[in-house]
Amino acid sequence: MSQEDWMWQMQNRITDLATLKNHITLSAEEESVFQAAQEQFSFSITPYYLSLLDPTNPTCPIRKQVLPRSSELVRAENEWEDPLAEQIHMPIKGVTHRYPDRAIWYISHICAVYCRFCTRKRKVSKPTETPNREEWREALEYFRNHTEIKEVILSGGDPLTLSDQHIDYLLGELSAIDHINHLRIHTRYPVTMPMRITDSLCGIFSKYFPLYIVTHFNHPKELTQEVKVAVTKLIQKGNVTLLNQSVLLKDVNDTVEILEELNYKLVRFGIKPYYLHQCDEVYGSSGFVVPIEDGIRLMYDIRGRMSGLTVPNYVKDLTGGGGKVLLGPNYLIEKKESSYLFKNFNGGEYEVTH
C-alpha cells in the first residue's frame, strides 16, 4: 500500500501532538492549546493535506483551518453546540428533515481532516453518533414514506469514508425511490484526500445520474494537481455535477484577491462555486468569523470584477434552524448594536446576530 492509496492516507493520519511536532514547527500558542482543544474536538490530518501546510508559518491558510488556536477555547454567548438545530429536526437517527422537500442523512462520523470551524463538532469523530445498519433501514423506510422529499443529501463526517460497496448500496436504494428527484453528496475528500476518488468509485457514481457532489474548497492552495486529476475523473468517469461551498474565514480567504483566485481556479477545474457561507455560530468559532458587513463588501467588489460563473451566493444558515438566507447589499435594512436586520425575497424580515 502506497501514499497514493486512500486507505494508506487514512491509516497514517496524524492525530497527536508528538507526531505532529515531527513534521512542523508549532508556535507557542498552537502547542499550548493543542491538548485542551483536543479534549473538546479531535485532531486529524492526512499526510497529503499536511504536505500543503507551511511547516513554519503560523499564518498559513491551510494551517489555520486545522490547528487549534486559543480562540477555540472561548465560547461566545451567541455560539451553540448545534447552531443549525439539526438534532431538533431529526425524526430518525442520522436524518435531519428541516426543509420540506429535502433531507440530510448523516452516515459517517469520520473525516480525514477535522476542520476547527466544523458545524458538527458536537458529534463528528464520535462513533455512537453514526447510524448502524438497522438504522440505515429505518432511514430508507422514512424516505420511502415521505413523498414530499425530492432530494437526499449524504453527509457526515464524510460519506466517502464508507466502502465502495456501501456507497453503491445506499445510492441504489435511494435511486429506487420514485419520488426522489436527485441525490447529493457533501464531501471534503477531494480537498483533503483526493486519492479517494478511484476509478471504481467513479464507476459507481456513473450509475446514478443525476448525482451532485458538493466539495468544500476554502483556499486556492487546496486546488493542487492531484485535485485536478481527481476532479476530472469525477466529471468524465463518474458523470457527476460538481459544486463547491466555501466558508468565509478570517485571515484565510477574506480578501477579494483570494476569493477571485479560488473561484476562477474552481471553474477552471470544472467546479461551479455554489455557496460562500458565513461561518456558523458553533462554539469556538469566533476566531474565524468575518463581520457580515465585510462579507457583503467583498461580494459587492467581486460581482463588479468577476464572471458570473465564478460568483457564489453569499449565505448565512440562521442559528436556531431558520435555514439559509441570502446576504447582500440589496437586502440589508439596518445594522443594530448586536445584529443585522435583513429583508428576504418574499418581503419578510429576519435578524442575524454579529
Language-model segments: what does each one mean?
Residues 97-134, 185:
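Canonical Radical SAM [4Fe-4S] cluster-binding loop centered on the CxxxCxxC motif
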